[in-house]
Amino acid sequence: MTAQQKVNLLGLSRPQMEEFFLTMGEKKFRAQQVLKWIHHHQADSFEQMTDVGKALRQKLSEVAEIRGPKVTHESISRDGTRKWVFEMDNGGAVETVFIPDGRRGTLCVSSQVGCAVDCSFCSTGKQGFQRDMTSAEIIGQVWQASRAFGPRRNLGQHPITNVVMMGMGEPLLNYDKVLTAMRIMKDDLGYGIGKKRITVSTSGVIPKMNQLSEDLDVSLAVSLHAPNDELRNQLVPLNRKYPLKDLMAACKRYSKNITHRHNTITMEYVMLRDVNDKPEHARQLVKLLNGIPVKVNLIPFNPFPHAGYERSRKNDILEFHKYLNDNGVMTTVRTTRGDDIDAACGQLVGQVKDRTRRSERWKESIFHRTEQTDDNTAQTQ
């Protein structure tokens, strides 16, 4: 059996790992042993698994592997932010960012090689789209970051306390693989991260938002960026498929469905000078969010070459922030981190092959796939 045919155990959730061992004729408890070695001790070889018999280790080496994405570059910012560039098997690359903040350590994870949602202010979208990432490649970013920080002996003794699916790509357009990876993050045999500390950021793929609230009610962030459809159509093209009225209704449903105590949805709003930062935009935003438990996170735009946008003036950001808070909308201003290593929000680019043609094909497929999802949902109702 070639290396390409081997099962990569890094990307298997607990039920999948148990099924794998059952098909080998082994007991289910072997799954627990191997999961701990992989995710608690960051093992990359079966020979490291000293409580697994030699015969089984040999058998595993013939049919399986533990293989994460390859680290090709690491940068450390003056503020302590760390960025890794990971090479994919096909030659593309993605970027992953770790942001330390006191006792909290947040890992920003990518879900696709590139992105075809093509938000006009985001450098990732400018790079085009190549493919979805596998569950092993997604959880492999957490695994590799954990290896960089050293082995974890017990839960709670690890600098990664939070994970945000806010790296390259639209997570809900790679739903199944992202879901598997998040289940591994949440599992005590994986990384033991509570569901309220795992956040999925979406540009508004409504059918998958509805499904996520039923499958794994993690925290949700919505890339909003505009208070009306006309402007959001320009900034976030997916809005043409899922307009704000439908998106706000989906947010209300999600908030009602999640079971953990913190059911507030984060609304991400990048501040673009003279584009979406005027007083009338603040007034429209308050009206739009009325009745939805939200927190607005204002994000000063992080420039990149040929962006076509500028960061809002500091005073405009402060006035926008004040108006929202004064009118009952909890609002914060995100502190820019890692901009000196191009690790700030909207700056991740990685490396994508055949950018233009792949991106155009994927944009078409987004609308085709979401239409199919809508049709399937209608048939089941």
From Swiss-Prot:
Gene3D superfamilies: 1.10.150.530, Aldolase class I
Residues annotated to bind [4Fe-4S] cluster: 115, 119, 122
GO molecular function term, any single one: tRNA (adenine(37)-C2)-methyltransferase activity
Bridged cysteine pairs (disulfide): 108-345
Pfam families registered for this protein in UniProt: Radical_SAM (PF04055), RlmN_N (PF21016)
Swiss-Prot/TrEMBL keywords: 4Fe-4S, Cytoplasm, Disulfide bond, Iron, Iron-sulfur, Metal-binding, Methyltransferase, rRNA processing, S-adenosyl-L-methionine, Transferase, tRNA processing
Gene Ontology CC annotation, any one: cytoplasm
Cofactor or coenzyme needed: [4Fe-4S] cluster
InterPro entries linked: Aldolase_TIM, Methyltransferase_A, RlmN_N, RNA_MTrfase_RlmN, rRNA_lsu_MTrfase_RlmN/Cfr, rSAM
Cofactor binding note of this UniProt entry: Binds 1 [4Fe-4S] cluster. The cluster is coordinated with 3 cysteines and an exchangeable S-adenosyl-L-methionine.
Family membership noted in the UniProt record: Belongs to the radical SAM superfamily. RlmN family.
This protein's name: Dual-specificity RNA methyltransferase RlmN
